[in-house]
């Protein structure tokens, strides 16, 4: 019986970029690896260990090249990595040393952020060779095999291409994506940052969720409302939700989303749901005959039904001292509009 190949467990690198690893090039703890770049050039990467107190200052992430939305790297979203990186780092990050001497992290921004939070060192495969922006972007796409980029992170990258003048059709062709996915990604990227930042684990957000946030942003924008008031109003409740450690991440997301939509509805509909206040001006024996005043907010109107022209043509309202001198009559019911007031 032939043995079946066991499936690979863990992180695998794209074989097209890995030209080989020579074990003889590893002396002691020093590891050397050669990657093939998109231009056909080869670059040698040597492992370095960045001390805990230098990780933040000696490394950086260019989101344009890395592709990971750095604002989404919250302590809660990094929980799984933080719990392991304190003891060991299974895979090194990959970076290039720039002219400033700092290391740009092409792959491993989540490991970098976790190392900073936990105050531990960071292992990085670093090359001192000059790598172009295009080579860096392609290499980052090839080696990133950890957590798949969210539709918003993809959209943020595509948004830069669109802002550079590319059409959505050209973007789709260049990235090997359908035009529908490009549209969805761009819409997710347009969701208000202020609202997205309220979610501790943004990778839980779906396209439908981003559409909801976009709708909230549009509605508040139409009413010239700022997000600050909304955020201030719901922050205590969000803190209460986040204080429940055992709550599942998707449940946390759903609760926060409901808070946002509910508060946005209250803010945008404020004043539009004022109930009409109706005051009876005269009591008639005929139940279908009436004379009344209706007030809704700052607007008011007078309504009459089954009254003669003589009565409605010139009606004096003693309650406010206003003489109504003009009326428009429709069928047997009448609503005074427009008004001519004399005080």
Swiss-Prot record:
Top-level taxon: Bacteria
Similarity remark: Belongs to the ParB family.
Database matches in CDD domains: sopB_N
GO terms of molecular function: DNA binding
DNA-binding region: 169-188
Name of the gene this protein is made from: parB
Name used for this protein in its record: Plasmid Partition par B protein
GO BP term, pick one: plasmid partitioning
Pfam families tied to this protein: ParB, ParBc
Naturally occurring in which organism (per UniProt): Escherichia coli
Keywords: DNA-binding, Plasmid, Plasmid partition
Start and end residues of each stretch annotated as Disordered: 1-26, 56-76
């Amino acid at each position: 019986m032939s043995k079946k190949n066991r499936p690979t467990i863990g992180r695998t690198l794209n074989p097209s970029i890995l030209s080989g690893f020579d074990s003889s090039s590893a002396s002691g703890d020093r590891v050397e690896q050669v990657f093939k770049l998109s231009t056909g050039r080869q670059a040698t990467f040597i492992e370095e260990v960045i001390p805990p107190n230098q990780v933040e200052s000696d490394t950086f992430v260019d989101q344009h090249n890395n592709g990971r939305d750095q604002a989404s790297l919250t302590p809660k979203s990094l929980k799984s990595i933080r719990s392991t990186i304190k003891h060991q780092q299974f895979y090194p990050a990959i970076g290039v040393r720039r002219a400033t001497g700092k290391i740009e992290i092409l792959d491993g921004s989540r490991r970098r952020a976790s190392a900073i939070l936990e105050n531990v060192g960071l292992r990085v495969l670093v090359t001192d060779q000059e790598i172009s922006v295009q080579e860096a972007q392609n290499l980052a796409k090839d080696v990133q095999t950890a957590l798949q980029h969210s539709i918003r992170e993809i959209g943020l990258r595509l948004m830069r291409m669109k802002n550079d003048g590319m059409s959505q059709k050209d973007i789709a062709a260049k990235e090997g994506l359908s035009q529908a996915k490009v549209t969805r990604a761009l819409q997710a990227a347009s969701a208000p940052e202020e609202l997205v930042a309220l979610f501790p684990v943004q990778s839980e957000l779906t396209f439908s969720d981003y559409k909801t946030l976009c709708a909230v942003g549009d509605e508040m924008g139409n009413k010239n409302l700022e997000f600050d008031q909304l955020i201030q109003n719901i922050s205590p409740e969000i803190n209460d939700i986040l204080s429940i450690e055992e709550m599942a991440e998707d449940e946390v997301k759903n609760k926060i989303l409901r808070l946002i939509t509910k508060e946005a509805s209250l803010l945008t509909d404020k004043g539009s749901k004022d109930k009409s206040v109706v005051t009876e001006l005269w009591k008639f024996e005929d139940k279908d005959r009436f004379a009344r005043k209706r007030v809704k907010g700052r607007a008011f109107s007078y309504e009459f039904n089954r009254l003669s022209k003589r009565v409605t043509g010139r009606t004096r309202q003693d309650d406010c001292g206003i003489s109504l001198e003009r009326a428009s009559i429709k069928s047997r019911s009448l609503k005074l509009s427009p008004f001519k007031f004399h005080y």
